[in-house]
Amino acid sequence: YDSTIRDVLSRLSAPGAKSWPYEPGAAWRDLGANELVLGRDAAYELGGSNNPAGNFTCVTTDGLLVPEDRVTLVGPDIGAIKGDCPFCRVVLLHVNDISGDDQEAFSAIRSMEFVKYHVFPEGYMMRISPENQREQVRVSKQAVKRGLSFRNIGNSFIKKYKENSLIDHVQIFFVTGDRAVCCELSATAKKVDAITLTLNHIMDGLATDCSVCSFKPVCDEVEGLKELHFKKGEKPMNV
């Protein structure tokens, strides 16, 4: 995922972006289960009204790419948003060396991705679709009145990620309001998902003729996937 991480960092290093270091005490109250925020109780829905809405997670062992825990916001904060708008959330994880074989390492990475299903900030109802990488969020009127911010939400996510001893650093980005950027990031989310599916295909040890494999475009584009296939003992044909 390293090339994708570099692209994300370049794309989201926009002037005017707000950024905060990780502060566990700034995490919002977690309810332990997803809260039902009804339409009449919502101030607005991030990604609602057919706006783009995406999320994805990238993992790296390169500490230079993700050197610290940080929350970054590109766009208006929760209190400044007045209605449904484009939205995207991106998480970059720096992990330490994962022991075990490739399958165990891959399983560990997948478990990190599932953290997003275990964060339940009060007044912030996430609706995540793994099929199309969409993430819509209903924000309650009460949470807005109480001063909920993306700094709070980001700290809540990082706090949950830090429960995993394999994770060294977390950087989380929230993008709001910019349709073009959110559309681009939604496309990146699909690319990241394709990489993950290809890794899963390789880890299953499936021999394949590269000329007919549906994952060939991904292997051609992403450095290291073909080498991993060689390592698994299934030399691709017609490379």
Q: Where on the chain are the PLM-derived regions?
A:
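Short Fe-S-cluster ligation motifs
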Residues: 176-180, 237-239
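Ordered core of a single globular domain
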Residues: 2-16
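Short loop/turn segments that flank or connect secondary-structure elements
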Residues: 14, 20-25, 29-30
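Long, charged N-terminal interaction/targeting segments
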Residues: 27-171
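N-terminal cysteine/histidine-rich coordination modules
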Residues: 214-215, 235-239
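Cysteine-cluster motifs in flexible loop/terminal segments that predominantly coordinate metals
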Residues: 183-231
